[in-house]
Design a protein with these regions (language model features):
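A conserved catalytic-core segment of Leloir-type glycosyltransferases
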Residues: 1, 46-142
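Nucleotide-activated donor-dependent transferases that construct or modify glycoconjugates
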Residues: 1-19, 44-46
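Structural motif
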Residues: 5, 147-148
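Hydrophobic/aromatic beta-strand patches that form the interior of the parallel beta-sheet core
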Residues: 7, 41-43, 90-92
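Alpha-helix N-cap/helix-initiation motif
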Residues: 15-23, 120-124
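Short amphipathic alpha-helix
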Residues: 22-32
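Hydrophobic anchor at the start of a short beta-strand
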Residues: 38-40, 89, 146-147
């Protein structure tokens, strides 16, 4: 019996961007599922930290329209691979939402330093609604139809 086709969407993946345990699970689970014979891919935002890293990423020719209420925004798709696996990682680029993290300036993936406090970005809900919708727009470009989107 053939394995499942799984698309794992995560705001962070160890080896690419990490603030906590979610990133560890988002890297380990796809590796394990792939080793068990399932076809797996990961989708995540393309953060500034990934661009600054030595992680090899490949720009694709795919630009996805992403409906957001009455607006249609666009994102470009990049591709990489999860280390020590055959699992592709699709990186969703939309600079206004994801190109703001810079630890030297007190800005992380989800929060910024403000005075002596860390505060969430005011548009976090919108940023990750966009990401969720972009993942749905990504599906036709995967080369497989997922049985599970997680």
């Amino acid at each position: 019996m053939p394995g499942l086709r799984v698309l794992l969407a995560s705001s962070e993946v160890a080896g690419f961007a990490k603030t906590g345990g979610l990133a560890d699970v988002a890297a380990a689970l796809p590796r394990a599922l792939s080793r068990l014979g399932n076809q797996v891919a990961i989708a995540m935002p393309l953060y500034a930290a990934i661009r600054r890293s030595n992680i090899p990423i490949e720009r694709t020719n795919v630009v996805l329209p992403v409906p957001m209420g009455p607006r249609v925004l666009a994102c470009r798709l990049y591709r990489s691979q999860l280390a020590n696996s055959e699992v592709p990682v699709y990186l969703i680029e939309h600079e206004p939402y994801y190109d703001r993290d810079n630890p030297r300036e007190g800005r992380g993936l989800y929060q910024q330093q403000s005075g002596g406090n860390r505060t969430d970005y005011a548009d976090n809900a919108e940023r990750f609604v966009f990401f969720s919708r972009a993942v749905m727009e990504l599906v036709p470009h995967l080369g497989f139809t997922p049985d599970v989107i997680h």
